[in-house]
Amino acid sequence: MQRLSLGVPELDQAILGGIPKGSLVLVLGPPGAGKSILGKLFLHTGLVAGVQTFMVSTAEADQAIAETMAMFRWTAGVPERVHVLDCYSWRLGGKRSKYSVPLTSLTEVSVSLSKLFDDYKIHPEGNERLVVDSFTDFVKYVGVDKSLKFLDYLRQKLRENGVTGMLMLEEGVHAPRTIAAVEYSTDGTIRMKVSEQGRFMMASRMQATPLAQKWIQFTIGK
């Protein structure tokens, strides 16, 4: 089974080298635990490997994403191979690109995602990566039921195209049954937490991967 590296050696080792290709993994943790940075590191690791990467962004525009990655010196390939589906700018009353869509219309989100994949000629033999940051905003703006239906569509879309994905979800915001439903519709879960001792992560479940569930301290540096 082909696996794609997260970019965090300790966690890659714990999950036999990375996330299984074509799977969609939930990243669950409280604010400040490092979910968004992990997502950008996942994309950066793909850029280093020379593949196209995609971000479905609900919390920041493409310029902010590029600036954050530049802070960590993850700049190689960013303008050419980080493609942002902007689900954020509509809140400000603007449309920054042809890939800007309102989060309140999941039909438009789905159509634009398909257009992105078509425009960049994504095919199952590739090793492309996608991050959704954050699925919490989907639930906030369109509700649990519609968000879960979109999640099922997204999972199938990634699988058909051989794209490996991460889905960020805020812990402490959603009802336990919502988190359970999201876990049911994804292929694995990476949990994150933060304390005075630092940041920690753990793979609590992963498709086709035996796991020793153990918290791993990590630092994402420059």
What is the role of each PLM region?
Residues L6-G18:
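Pre-Walker A adenine-sensing motif
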Residues V25-L28:
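Short hydrophobic/aromatic beta-strand immediately N-terminal to the Walker A/P-loop
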Residues P30-V101:
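Conserved P-loop
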Residues Q52, R81, E125-R129, E160-M168:
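Loop/turn-to-beta-strand initiation segments
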Residues A59-Q63, Y88-L92, F135-D137, E171-A175, ...:
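Conserved nucleotide-binding/hydrolysis micro-motifs of P-loop NTPases
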Residues R91-R159:
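Phosphate-binding/switch loop-helix module in NTP-utilizing enzymes
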Residues V163-T164, M168-K222:
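Phosphate-binding/switch region of NTP-binding enzymes
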